[in-house]
C-alpha cells in the first residue's frame, strides 16, 4: 500500500548526523585538491570586489601562483569574506560572476595594438579570451566533477547511531541531497526515494547544481546597481585632472548608450568584448538550475502525491532556489495536509513562517520542531535499536 507520508530531506539532515557536508567544507576540499578552482571562485564571484576579499592585491596574485604550483610552499591567502559568506551560499553566488573584474583582467592581457599592426598576433588575442573560457569552465564542469568526488568522501561521524531519528520507513522520500544515507543507514528502499538533483551513484559530473536567478532579471538588477558608479560615467578624470572618454571595458560593454561612439581605442578591444559577452551568457545558461525541466522529468512522482496527508521537512533551508519544487508539491497535494518542519536557528523559524504564509498553511497545520526531538522519540519507540 502506498504511504500517505512524505519526507522532504535537505542538507541539514546529513549535517545533523555529523557529515561535514556544508559548502564551506567543500571549499576546504578544493583548497586541498583543486586550488585553482577555489581561487577562481574566490576572486571572480560574489558582490564584493576582488580587492576587498584580500588584504592586498599581492594576495590576489598569490592565489593563482599557489593554485598553479608557482609558489614554493606558500599559504593560500585568507579571504574572510569568501569563507564566511561566499561559500555558505555557494549555489546562489554562481549567479554573481563579477563581469567587471573579468573584463578588467581581459583588458590587461589583450594586445595593445590593432589587427592590421605589425606586432599583432592572434595567439595573443585569444590568450585572454581562452583564459575567460578556462575560468568559466573551472566553475562549471570542473566544479561539478569535484563536487561529485567530494560527495563520495562524506560519512557520518563516529557515534551517529545515538542520534538516529524516528522515521517512518514505509513513507515516501524526496531528497535534495546527493548522499545515500537514507538507504545505507536507515535502510529505506531505493524505490521509495526520489533523488531530485541526482545521487552519488550517478555518472561523475552529472549532479545538478546551479543558481536560480533569471538571466535577464539578474542582469538588469546588476546594471541598475552600478549605473551611477563613478567608474561608469561617460567621462573620467586622469591623474592630472583632465577629462577623457571612459575607456573601461565594463563601461563600454554595459553602460555605453551608443557603441559606435565609444572610446574603444582599437578594433581588438571591441571584438574581444563581443566575444567575451557571448561566453558570459553561455556560462549563465549552463549554470542556471533547470528546475522546470527537472520537475517535468519527475512528473510521475509529483502526480502521485495526491494521497499525501502528512509532510515532514527534515533539514531543508526552504531556500528560494528550491521553491519551484514546493510550488509543484503544493499543486499536487490536498489543502488539509499536515506539515512538520525542522528548524536549527532563529532564522529558520522566520523562513518557516514565510513559507507557511506563501502556501496558506495555518499554524494548526504546521508543527515546528528540532531534529533532536525525533531522536528522542526513536529512543522511546525502539530503545534497543541503538
Regions picked out by a protein language model, each given a short descriptive name:
Residues 1-40:
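An N-terminal structural lobe/cap that precedes and organizes the functional/catalytic core
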Amino acid at each position: 500500500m502506498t504511504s500517505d507520508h512524505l519526507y522532504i530531506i535537505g542538507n541539514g539532515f546529513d549535517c545533523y548526523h555529523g557529515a561535514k557536508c556544508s559548502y564551506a567544507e567543500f571549499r576546504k576540499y578544493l583548497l586541498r585538491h583543486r586550488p585553482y578552482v577555489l581561487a577562481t571562485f574566490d576572486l571572480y564571484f560574489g558582490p564584493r570586489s576582488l580587492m576587498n576579499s584580500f588584504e592586498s592585491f599581492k594576495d590576489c596574485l598569490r592565489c593563482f601562483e599557489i593554485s598553479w604550483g608557482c609558489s614554493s610552499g606558500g599559504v593560500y591567502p585568507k579571504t574572510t569574506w569568501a569563507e564566511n559568506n561566499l561559500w555558505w551560499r555557494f549555489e546562489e553566488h554562481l549567479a554573481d560572476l563579477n563581469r567587471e573584474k573579468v573584463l578588467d583582467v581581459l583588458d590587461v592581457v589583450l594586445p595593445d595594438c590593432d589587427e592590421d599592426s605589425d606586432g599583432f598576433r592572434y595567439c595573443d588575442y585569444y590568450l585572454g579570451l581562452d583564459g575567460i573560457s578556462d575560468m568559466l569552465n573551472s566553475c562549471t564542469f570542473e566544479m561539478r566533477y569535484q563536487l561529485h568526488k567530494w560527495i563520495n568522501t562524506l560519512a557520518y561521524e563516529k557515534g551517529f547511531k545515538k542520534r538516529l531519528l524516528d522515521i517512518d520507513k514505509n513513507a515516501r522520500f524526496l531528497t535534495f541531497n546527493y548522499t545515500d544515507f537514507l538507504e545505507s543507514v536507515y535502510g529505506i528502499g531505493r524505490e521509495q526515494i526520489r533523488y531530485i538533483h541526482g545521487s552519488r551513484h550517478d555518472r561523475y559530473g552529472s549532479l545538478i547544481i546551479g543558481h536560480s536567478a533569471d538571466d535577464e532579471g539578474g542582469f538588469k538588477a546588476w546594471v541598475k546597481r552600478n549605473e551611477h558608479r563613478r567608474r561608469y560615467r561617460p567621462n573620467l578624470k586622469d591623474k592630472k585632472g583632465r577629462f577623457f572618454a571612459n575607456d573601461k571595458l565594463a563601461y563600454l560593454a554595459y553602460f555605453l548608450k551608443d557603441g559606435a561612439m565609444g572610446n574603444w581605442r582599437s578594433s581588438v578591444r571591441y571584438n574581444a568584448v563581443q566575444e567575451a559577452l557571448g561566453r558570459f551568457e553561455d556560462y549563465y545558461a549552463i549554470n542556471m538550475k533547470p528546475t522546470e525541466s527537472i520537475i517535468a522529468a519527475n512528473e510521475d512522482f509529483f502526480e502521485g502525491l495526491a494521497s499525501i496527508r502528512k509532510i515532514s521537512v527534515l533539514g531543508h533551508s526552504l531556500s528560494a532556489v528550491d521553491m519551484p519544487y514546493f510550488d509543484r508539491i503544493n499543486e499536487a497535494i490536498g489543502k488539509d495536509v499536515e506539515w512538520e518542519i525542522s528548524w536549527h536557528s532563529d532564522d529558520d523559524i522566520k523562513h518557516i513562517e514565510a513559507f507557511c504564509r506563501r502556501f496558506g498553511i495555518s499554524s494548526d497545520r504546521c508543527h515546528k520542531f528540532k531534529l533532536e526531538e525525533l531522536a528522542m522519540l526513536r529512543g522511546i519507540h525502539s530503545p534497543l535499536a541503538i
